[in-house]
């Protein structure tokens, strides 16, 4: 009888262990899924904060995301990397929401040397804000931290050079500078598409990844960038009216991969 019970236990024990393991894995999966949803919700909240703090900055990061995705797709980046590029573009200036920097960016006067030094801390501050999400978005903070690095190693905050700069940051750097040149800032007027194109070309191999610059300046990519700019500058009411009459050009063939709310040599100040 005792031997029979032991034999039965030998059969039951593996089943019990297997069931317990399955249960633990299921609970772990549910907890991770919940944490991922909370992380995504946190990113959405941060994007809302960017909009609420400065509508101009909100428009800027969305345009940068659009241009970065155009360049990333042309470079043949895989879907995961494109997700990362988009997130870095949308949150590259999140560090500017730090209390010590908010007043500086809302002040319309020219930056003082002290203010310039303070502004240059925004990549680190942004990476710090995003650090709690690094378990789910490990490349996001790295890209935000490096978006002001330069190909020749003279950027900040760490002076990274060449391909030591994360790819997502190299892509976003070009898109960020292009948008800064073509839109009015507190310290400069908006310049033309042609001026911006020449400035990006001038930064090839010094400020920017030369291969990405070649791609950005190729006719197919520039055509998409130009189309995206026209779409972004068109007033919302006019867009709706044109769509009703069937007169509007289609929006650029770019799909935002993360945000459900997608919208539509440079001077040193322009890189802040």
Map each language-model feature to its residues.
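Non-catalytic interface/linker regions that flank or bridge core catalytic/transmembrane domains
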Residues: 1-49, 246-272
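Metal-dependent catalytic cores of enzymes that make or break cyclic nucleotides
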Residues: 52-62, 66-261
